[in-house]
Amino acid sequence: YQVRYSGLGHASAAMQVRVDFKLPGPKKFTILSETGSGMLRHHVLEPLVKAERQNAVVTSNDGSALVPANYKFRLVAAPDDNGNGKYVLEATPRTSKQRFLFHGTIWLNASDFGIERVQGKLPHSPSFWVKNVTFDYHTQKIGAFWLPATNKTRAHIRFFGHAVLEIRYHDFDLTSIAPVPTAAAAGGRP
């Protein structure tokens, strides 16, 4: 995790975090190192890691999952006849009551429909102090799985300036992986 602030002065902080996960969960977060501004580490990065610990289990029943119950999807672009390009969807929240739903764009891989990128804006400010939150989330395919690659979030801090939070995911170690059965693999329709 890395955060940069500019406004009434400039500051930055970084935190390296190891995340371990084994089914059925939960994820285990271990802070390996911290550098930079103590204020940003204690008031931004540590609460972020704490929130990720609390929200580590995401299911299709979760109020922020990318499912039709939470979003209206509109196809914006599709691959050409040769399979070149991506499926591009516009996502609009079905309700304004869920805190972390977003307005944005989703890019899907043309061959396996994996989510490659999500870019959007939160329709509501998460707090009085934070507004105009935008994000750009990228994934990477490792083996048969789409896993996080980067997440860059920008926000305006009321009266004080701007902050950029960047999370880079790397050094994945996948062991004992069994693909999840799909309806198509079971002889059904997807």
Located regions from the model:
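Short, positively biased Gly/Pro-containing turn/loop motifs at secondary-structure boundaries
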Residues: 146-150
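Structured extracytoplasmic
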Residues: 1-103, 111-114, 123-133, 140-145, ...
